[in-house]
């Protein structure tokens, strides 16, 4: 989860390309290969900045992970087991949505905290198992919901492939019409 949410957050919060536009051949001729590569990387890195589909997926994942789960009449969340994010102020850039386990010796941010997860596993393993099963199910359902078929996209796609296909067909048709008009004009003259 952490690797995925960190990557999504990084892509979503990417720096703006600002005034960077694709380079023309003339502009490329005046630049070194390194300069061209940096320029194009800046544009590519910002392609998914504030992308609505990516934002929706990110929000769905975060909601699934943070929603309380009721087991035997009691509500639990990840924080009940000492698993929580560091938040915007304490986390590294684009890692504010990643979860950390209190008492984890390998995590310098939370290693000094009490290990609530181990306590819960020792005292009531069935509750922890039930919670984790339900959490996994909730996350799966949230992602499945995002990948449902719609008038704009096919099932298991998170981008609007049907819409893109329709736009591609329309543009191809328009290009053919203009090519035909140009050909007719050339034949006329």
Per-region residue spans from a language model:
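Structural flexibility/helix-modulation signal
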Residues: 3-176, 180-181
């Amino acid at each position: 989860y952490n690797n995925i949410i960190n990557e999504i957050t990084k892509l979503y919060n990417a720096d703006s390309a600002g005034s960077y536009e694709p380079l023309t051949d003339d502009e490329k001729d005046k630049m070194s290969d390194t300069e061209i590569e940096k320029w194009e990387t800046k544009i590519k890195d910002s392609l998914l900045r504030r992308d609505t589909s990516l934002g929706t997926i990110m929000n769905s994942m975060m909601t699934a992970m943070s929603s309380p789960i009721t087991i035997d009449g009691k509500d639990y969340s990840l924080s009940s087991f000492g698993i929580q994010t560091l938040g915007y102020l304490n986390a590294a850039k684009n890692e504010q949505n990643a979860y950390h386990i209190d008492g984890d010796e390998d995590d310098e941010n939370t290693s000094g905290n009490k290990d609530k997860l181990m306590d819960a596993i020792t005292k009531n393993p069935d509750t922890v198992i039930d919670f984790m099963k339900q959490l996994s199910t909730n996350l799966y359902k949230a992602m499945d919901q995002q990948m449902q078929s719609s008038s704009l996209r096919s099932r298991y796609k998170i981008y609007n492939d049907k819409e893109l296909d329709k736009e591609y067909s329309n543009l191809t048709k328009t290009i053919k019409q203009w090519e035909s008009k140009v050909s007719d004009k050339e034949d006329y003259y």
